[in-house]
From Swiss-Prot:
Protein name: Uncharacterized membrane protein YjcL
Gene name of this polypeptide: yjcL
Record-level GO cellular component terms: plasma membrane
InterPro entries membership: DUF819 (IPR008537)
Subcellular location: Cell membrane
UniProt source species: Bacillus subtilis (strain 168)
Length: 396
């Protein structure tokens, strides 16, 4: 589809992504309304607008570069200041609500399938793909698409609907903590801590106070991040080459799980080195803002209307069912709201987008735990997707 900026205009696209990320951060720290909305939402929503008015292309190698290189570099930078013992404490609670959210995906898939099975071709295959994807992530989506041999045009239409749904759900999840009803009915200790840290004036501006940072800090942050990513990619690639079982390739061969685990191990072994590094949070957060811009770009309403209106309804039912089940169970079992929202994000969008949300909201204690727990979805997603797809096919 034609756009003002072509998909191969690399420098212009990089310029737009970086400038819009900077504008989003600037607005968040300058205006109270923008701080309330959050810079992440401004970055994402602005990118959606620019796509839908025909300025940005829906696809480009530049966006792939952000996913392949920028996001992996951001992850260790954002983990350098964490408390390793706190990670394992938080992970137990997150694991429980993550599994509840996965049940929400399954229930939503069943509901959506029986409502729409007469109206969408190959819905058994699409149902298997989305069931796997909304527990794990894009890796599971691709695996199920290949397994069920879903026709290419329906895979493409589902990807379009899924991209739009993910952007919409991210907007909903990141906005929920600001709503009074949720503040009255759920515990929100992490959100309250962020507000307390920035209790005067603009909370975002107060949270991101100016810090001393030296050339050595920048060099050591960058060097450590690049080294950890490089080693993790090699290790995960090696494990993928020697193991064939999906369970092993899905854990030991997953680059994000290896990267997160290796980073946590190194921080545990050399805590004083990383405690003395300044600027890691700031550098990592800016990289994540580039990611926020990129995930908003594929949400093209024109493609939705043309190719996938009913599939969008299908994925919407599943995502909202996941959210509703998670909120209800979370309330029943007194799970903290931040953990519920991150679990929903991790199931529907994968651990990377969940970690990005935790970063955007300032819930730094939950970044590493949700990355670790979210990768569990990669393991169980394919099993659930296979079962659901085969079961759905018996009704067609």
């Amino acid at each position: 589809m034609h756009s003002l900026i072509s998909s191969d205009d690399v420098w212009v696209l990089w310029g737009f992504i970086a400038v819009w990320a900077a504008v989003s951060i600037g607005l968040e720290q300058r205006f109270k309304w923008a701080s309330a909305v959050s810079g992440a939402i401004i970055a994402l929503a602005g990118a959606m607008v620019f796509t839908n008015v025909g300025v940005l292309p829906v696809e480009s190698p530049v966006y792939d570069t952000v996913w392949s290189y920028v996001v992996p570099l951001a992850i260790p930078l954002l983990l350098f200041q964490i408390n390793v013992r706190q990670i394992f404490k938080e992970s137990r609670r997150l694991l429980f609500i993550f599994l509840i959210s996965s049940v929400g995906t399954v229930l939503g898939s069943i509901l959506a399938f029986f409502l729409l099975k007469q109206h969408i071709p190959y819905l058994d295959k699409i149902g298997g793909m989305i069931s796997a994807s909304y527990i794990g992530g894009g890796v599971n989506f691709a695996a199920m698409a290949a397994k069920f041999e879903t026709p290419g045009e329906y895979v493409s239409a589902t990807v379009v609907a899924d991209n739009f749904m993910m952007a919409l759900l991210f907007f909903i999840l990141i906005s929920i903590p600001a709503l009074k009803w949720f503040q009255r009915h759920y515990a929100m200790p992490f959100e309250e801590k962020v507000k307390a840290d920035g209790n005067s004036g603009n909370s975002a501006e107060s949270y991101w106070k100016r810090k001393d940072i030296s050339l050595k800090d920048i060099a050591f942050n960058a060097g450590a991040a690049f080294a950890l990513v490089a080693v993790s990619m090699k290790v995960s690639g090696y494990f993928k080459s020697i193991f064939s079982h999906p369970l092993l390739t899905g854990t030991l061969g997953d680059q994000y799980l290896v990267l997160t685990s290796l980073t946590v191990l190194i921080i545990f072994l050399f805590p004083r080195f990383f405690e003395r590094l300044n600027g890691s949070q700031e550098l990592g957060t800016f990289l994540i803002y580039l990611f926020f811009v990129v995930i908003g770009i594929p949400a093209d309403l024109r493609l939705i209307v043309t190719n996938a209106p009913l599939i969008l309804l299908f994925v919407f039912i599943i995502a909202i069912s996941n959210l509703a089940v998670s909120l209800a169970a979370g309330k029943l079992f007194r799970v903290r709201l931040e953990e519920i929202l991150l679990a929903v994000n991790a199931t529907v969008g994968g651990p990377t987008t969940a970690a990005a949300m935790a970063i955007a909201k300032g819930w730094r204690e939950l970044v590493a735990p949700i990355m670790l727990v979210g990768t569990l979805g990669y393991l169980i997603g394919n099993y659930v997707g296979t079962f659901m797809g085969n079961w759905f096919s018996s009704f067609l």
